[in-house]
Amino acid sequence: RVLVGKDEALLWALAAILARGHILLEDIPGVGKTTMALSFARALDLEYGRIQFTPDVLPSDITGYSVPDPQGGLSYRPGGILCNLFLADELNRATSRTQSALLEAMEEGQVTVDGISHPLPQPFVVIATQNPTGAAGTQLLPDSQVDRFTLRLTLGYPAPKDEAAMVKNRQAGNP
C-alpha cells in the first residue's frame, strides 16, 4: 500500500477513474498527490503521462505539434497528453492559455493541432493537482476548467501511525 490511511479518498478516485471522469487534487505539497496518480496508472495498467506545469510550459507541450517532413508535408509529434492517465501536476502554476489546452482533451477525448484532430487513447483520464490558491506562483482555475472535473479531492497530512506505516513499506522495498 502506497497511500496509507486515505481509503475513502482512494475509493472516490477509483470510482471517478472507472467512470472515465477527471479528478482535481487540491492540497499542499508533499501529501501524495503525484504518488496517488502514478499508483493508479500502475495498478490499472494504464499508459501514464505527466507534465509539471510551470509558467514556461506551452500548449504544444501538452497537445503536440506539427513539423515539416521530407515529403513536403507536416508530420505530427504527439504531446504529453496522448496517454491513458495524464497527470497535470501543479496545473494552477501554468498560464491560462496553457491550462486551456486541456479543455478539448477533457471534454472531447481529442486534441486538434493545425486543424487536424487526434483522438486520445481510451480510456482517457486526467488527474490534475493544484496547490491551494494563494500559494506563491499559483492562480485560480477558471470555472470552465473546474467544470470538466468529475471529482475534487484533498488528501491532507497522514496521521502519525499512517506515516510510520508508509516509511516501513518504503524500507521493505514497496513503492
Language-model region placement:
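Short loop/turn elements that form and flank the Walker-type P-loop nucleotide-binding site
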Residues: 11, 18-20, 31, 44, ...
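Conserved alpha-helical scaffold flanking the Walker A/P-loop in AAA+ ATPase domains
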Residues: 12-15, 66-88
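Conserved beta-strand position immediately N-terminal to the Walker
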Residues: 23, 86, 124
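Walker B catalytic acidic pair
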Residues: 27, 89-90, 101
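Canonical AAA+ ATPase core
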Residues: 69-72, 93-98, 106-175
